[in-house]
Structures are given as C-alpha cells and as structure tokens.
C-alpha cells in the first residue's frame, strides 16, 4: 500500500503476510532478504528450526519450500499479483489505495472521530470515536449495515477501530460506509 524500497532504506529483511497489502486470506508468511541478509542466514546459527532459513533458501533455488505450504493461498496470491499487473502494476495499485485512503479521510473529518495518527499509511485508517465504543460501532456496522471494519482487541477494543483501503474496494464503498456512520448518529 505504501512504497517500501529495501535497498534505499538499508533493510536486510522484509516480512509480511498474505493478508496484508495483497488482501488475500492469512496463512502465508513472505520473507524477502537482501544479499547481506542471505549471507547472515548462511553464516549464523539461528538456534531453532523456525528461525533457520537455510532450508528455505536451498529449497527456493529449486522453486520449492521446505514444508508443504497453504497451496490454495499461494494460488490466490498468484492470481492477485496477475490482477495487479493487468491493472497497471504496483504503482497503479499503490495509487488506487492512496486515492481510496485520501477520499475516506477527507470525508470522515466531518464525523465525531479523531485520527489516531497524523501520518497514517495508506493501507488502513485507525480512528478513535469521541463519544461511543469503537467495538459498538464495529458490531452495529456489521449487524445492521453489513459493512465490516476492523475492530481492535485488548485495551484498545472500545477506543479504536480501523478502516482498510486495500483489496477490491471502491469509492462507492467509502460512500456507503460514511453514509452508514452518519445514519448511526441519528
């Protein structure tokens, strides 16, 4: 959803999940290593099987994984990547996500919410309701309007909810959500 240039940032490892910016079901972890990161994997003992990426790198050379992955999710990732390419590539996808985020954030300003961050990423907008439980907003939108937003758990359950901007969402979805939020105030 936002540009991430490992080389420019000097990052040696990037870890994400299939459910993040690709908007696929959860179940696949994606790890990208810089050449320096690969060297570190081969030259250091990870101490346990789960953090030892040597087998994953060796299997990757032959196009395989060391363990059976969630094949259905891999196929969905493949399909999603093809759709991103067909729609103009990663820059076009990032532009679409940014446009959705900007549109939503501009419209939600008139409602009784505070932005949790002054510089949020484009994938999600966290909001703090001023006078009602965040979890109650989540359940009302889900049960009465058939709209899903992202609830928080733990100490933040009643204080913050999140609105996502990735996947097959449109400006019309933003309009429907804003209208539902306005209707809930009546």
Language model: regions and residue ranges:
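Conserved PLP phosphate-binding loop immediately N-terminal to the Schiff-base lysine helix
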Residues: 1-17
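A common structural junction motif
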Residues: 143-149, 182-186
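Flexible, glycine/charged-enriched surface loops at secondary-structure junctions
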Residues: 87-97, 112-118, 152-154
């Amino acid at each position: 959803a936002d540009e991430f240039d490992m080389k420019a940032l000097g990052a040696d490892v990037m870890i994400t999940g299939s459910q993040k910016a690709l908007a696929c079901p959860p179940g696949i972890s994606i790890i990208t290593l810089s050449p320096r990161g690969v060297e570190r994997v081969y030259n250091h003992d990870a101490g346990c099987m789960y953090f030892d990426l040597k087998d994953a790198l060796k299997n990757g050379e032959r196009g395989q994984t060391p363990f059976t992955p969630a094949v259905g999710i891999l196929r969905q990732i493949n399909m999603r990547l093809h759709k991103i390419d067909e729609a103009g590539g990663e820059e076009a996808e990032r532009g679409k996500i940014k446009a959705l985020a900007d549109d939503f954030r501009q419209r939600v300003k008139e409602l009784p919410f505070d932005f949790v961050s002054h510089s949020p990423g484009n994938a999600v907008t966290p909001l703090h309701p001023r006078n009602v439980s965040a979890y109650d907003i989540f359940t009302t939108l889900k049960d009465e309007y058939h709209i899903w937003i992202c609830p928080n758990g733990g100490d933040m359950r009643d204080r913050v909810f999140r609105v996502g901007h990735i996947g097959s969402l449109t400006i019309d979805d933003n309009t429907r959500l804003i209208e539902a939020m306005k209707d809930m105030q009546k």
